[in-house]
């Protein structure tokens, strides 16, 4: 096939000339608009600005607002002095946004400055093992994330809700974190698990034995266990808890997480509640 090189070159030249004319036309139009804008009314100037720069302004405002919000939150962020999850519990006074008075009193006794630090009693986690509905599944996942991230110091809940977690090696052996004097004073309030049962549960999980059903001994009777380990402190009867929170089941117990960052504060809270109400274990 024969190509006419002369014709092809002429066509290219014509295209190039046209391309050069396009930017010139745009520039001429832009100059005309600027000239018209210079002599336009304020309303016309605003309309012109909004037409060409509206989205630039909107995006800039959003970015600035987000940056300002982040800086404000960071500057006013309080340190966590103590964080406990109240599993399957709810605040009785749902209309109040203030913490119960006993938390403020405890913080003061601990020397915790509320302007820079905070104590959190989280009642947002509800898990019903028998049904495992959507709320239970979501709460279970949330709880595991909190534990893995070292966010939690302790769990306060009823005996039934505590049982599964108490037998999963999540909580500290109280003998490892209490002084000799503290252990002697708190021993009447200990909640025990049998280490042999815990090991059997772990073995069944490793073998993926879904048919295994553990038999839990009475947590208040270590004499009936092969290897009793205190993992909880019974707070049943502490009116600061029962007057402010509703617990789904009977009894109240607190476990201190093995990876807790504020262990001493957790121990101090248990002592504060028990000493304040002179609780007799039932």
Go through each PLM region and give its residues:
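Periplasmic-binding protein-like
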Residues: 226-255, 273-282
């Amino acid at each position: 096939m024969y190509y006419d090189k002369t014709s092809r070159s002429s066509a290219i030249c014509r295209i190039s000339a046209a391309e050069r004319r396009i930017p010139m036309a745009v520039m001429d139009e832009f100059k005309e608009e600027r000239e018209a804008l210079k002599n336009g009314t304020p309303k016309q100037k605003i309309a012109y600005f909004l037409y060409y720069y509206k989205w630039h302004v909107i995006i800039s405002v959003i970015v600035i607002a987000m940056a300002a919000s982040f800086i404000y939150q960071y500057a006013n962020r309080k340190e966590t002095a103590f964080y406990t999850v109240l599993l399957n519990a709810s605040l009785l006074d749902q209309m109040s946004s203030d913490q119960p008075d006993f938390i403020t009193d405890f913080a003061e006794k601990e020397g915790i400055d509320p302007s820079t630090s905070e104590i959190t009693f989280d009642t947002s986690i509800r898990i019903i093992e028998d049904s495992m509905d959507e709320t239970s599944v979501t709460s279970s996942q949330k709880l595991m994330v909190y534990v893995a991230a070292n966010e939690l110091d302790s769990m306060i809940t009823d005996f039934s809700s505590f049982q599964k977690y108490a037998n999963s090696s999540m909580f500290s052996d109280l003998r490892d974190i209490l002084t000799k004097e503290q252990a002697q004073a708190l021993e009447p309030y200990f909640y025990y698990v049998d280490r042999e049962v815990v090991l059997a549960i772990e073995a069944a999980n490793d073998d993926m034995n879904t048919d295994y059903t553990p038999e839990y001994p009475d947590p208040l009777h270590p004499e009936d266990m092969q290897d009793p380990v205190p993992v909880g402190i019974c707070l049943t009867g502490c009116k600061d808890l029962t007057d402010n929170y509703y617990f789904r089941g009977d009894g109240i117990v607190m476990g201190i997480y093995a990876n807790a960052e504020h262990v001493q504060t957790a121990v101090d809270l248990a002592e504060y509640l028990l000493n304040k109400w002179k609780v007799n274990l039932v």
